[in-house]
Regions:
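Electropositive polyanion-binding surfaces
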Residues: 3-7, 19-24, 36-39, 67-68, ...
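Reverse-transcribing Pol proteins
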Residues: 59-74, 280
Length: 334
């Protein structure tokens, strides 16, 4: 076996030792005699390297989820709940996302002066301390990998709750009026909506033609300017999407389009509205806060036109954000 592995060849007689090496690569074992005999460190990385060299593993095998004990997707048998909901199906609710996105978490709409932000209503289906709650706690969040997505919730529940999967979708809707960038007349309710799913590319084209999207875009631009005047700093650092397509790594630079800015700002507004509602109604919840950073005057004065080098340098000037039970300033968001 050692002779074979030294020459990067294997046969069926080596299967036992290869499985032992595989356990090290997956962090299921800390040591195997064969790696020591080969003078190779007993680490997951070196074991992985050897398995690739011998072609026992394909380069398409992703050991990291199992290595880090990340729970895989599982289907659970679920009884979906039905609750009384406010009918908002008369509104055109836009769910804007990447063209290859399979699930929609949020949507936006306009009803006269009232803005609505709709969020997939997952919480209705998850009872505290239930099997489903435990499932989600083990995973904490969705994990987006180049070759797969590991969901926080069972895929069948994610599909059920995703907006736009059927003619009518269940949502938690946050409605409010915004005048001179001040939020008032907040309503939060469980709703039923009709969703129009759009890619960012299609939304960019529709911004000038669709009155609802055009009004929402103008609103978010005003709100962004309001935050900037109150000290907000957003660094436009490059982002990329890394995916595995047709057994090849595909890297695409995310373009900063009008519709991406629109959706991002609407989510900032949603956080502000919910925080204000919770404070006004004395509802206990976690608040994300951040103290004022230590930025130079040059960065503050030129924050809209920073070079890439200046932007990367500025990342070191932010104070660490904190989650607290008390509402307070988030300096980075203004």
């Amino acid at each position: 076996c050692v002779d074979n592995l030294q020459n990067n060849i294997v046969d069926e007689r080596d299967s036992f030792w290869l499985r032992e090496i595989e356990k090290v690569a997956l962090n299921q074992s800390k040591h195997t005699k064969v790696l020591s005999a080969l003078a190779i460190d007993n680490t997951p990385e070196r074991a992985h390297e050897l398995l690739l060299k011998t072609k026992y593993w394909s380069e398409l095998i992703n050991p990291y989820p199992e290595r880090h004990k990340i729970y895989p997707n599982e289907e659970l048998t679920l009884d979906f709940k039905e609750v009384t909901r406010e009918d908002l199906t008369h509104l055109k609710s836009f769910a804007i996302d990447n063209s290859d996105s399979s699930e929609a978490d949020d949507a936006i709409s306009l009803d006269g002066e009232r803005v609505w932000i709709h969020i997939a209503d997952v919480a209705t289906q998850v009872d505290i301390d239930s099997e489903l709650d435990g499932y989600a706690q083990k995973r904490a969040s969705n994990l987006y990998l180049p070759d797969q997505t590991i969901h926080m919730l069972p895929p069948n529940l994610s599909s059920f709750c995703s907006l736009g999967e059927s003619k009518k979708s269940s949502a938690l809707s946050v409605g409010f009026k915004i005048i001179d960038c001040q939020i008032n007349d907040i309503k939060i309710l469980q709703s039923e909506i009709e969703v129009v799913k759009m890619s960012y590319e299609d939304a960019d084209k529709a911004l000038k033609e669709d009155q609802v999207l055009s009004k929402l875009n103008n609103l978010t631009k005003s709100h962004k300017a309001f935050r900037n005047n109150n000290g907000a700093i957003k660094l436009d650092l490059p982002n990329v999407d890394v995916k595995l397509k047709n057994k090849k790594v595909d890297i695409q630079i995310q373009t900063e389009s009008e519709s991406r800015k629109l959706v991002a700002e609407m989510m900032v507004i949603a956080g502000r509205v919910i925080a204000q509602y919770a404070t006004e109604h004395k509802i206990s919840m976690p608040f994300l806060t951040q103290e004022v950073g230590s930025f130079s005057e040059d960065i503050i004065q030129n924050k809209e036109n920073l070079t890439a080098t200046q932007a990367f340098q500025a990342t070191r000037c932010f104070k660490q954000s904190k989650i607290t039970p008390k509402a307070s300033l988030h300096a980075g968001l203004g």
